[in-house]
């Protein structure tokens, strides 16, 4: 199966989840952002055992008005866009490429936060991403585009970037949900 076919199959599955919510897929977002035909995916075949067809992030490079950029687009249709060890490694790799090329990094955020099933390794992944955000600060432009939830650990990386754009009525940034505050204490906050 070719890389294009794999991406197409994955995107068709994602459309069934995202479109009813009024949201685009990770690939659709990248295709709208980047110059037509310029997207080149990085690490498409890097997956975890839980998600052999693709992980909760699409990473790569492309151009905007002919200028090179590096991108990652979180995929909420795969485990709620949650960050686990493999997702973190893919994001860190594309951030490293951006630093080496002295090109902007654009993160399209649509994530329920840490992949709790993976325990501490998902939190370590966030720590590494935050460290990379700080390392890149003042060296390359870092841009966050919030197109869905950015919960828990997923909220801190955008706060460390240079610019944050948020889709009205759909994009959300929060460290903890209302349910997480009220459920354990049984108190109205």
Language model feature labels by segment:
Residues 179-185:
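Conserved small/polar residues in nucleotide/adenosyl-binding loops
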Residues 188-189:
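Short hydrophobic transmembrane-like helices used for membrane targeting/insertion
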Residues 1-143, 149, 154-156, 160-172, ...:
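Terminal-region recognition feature
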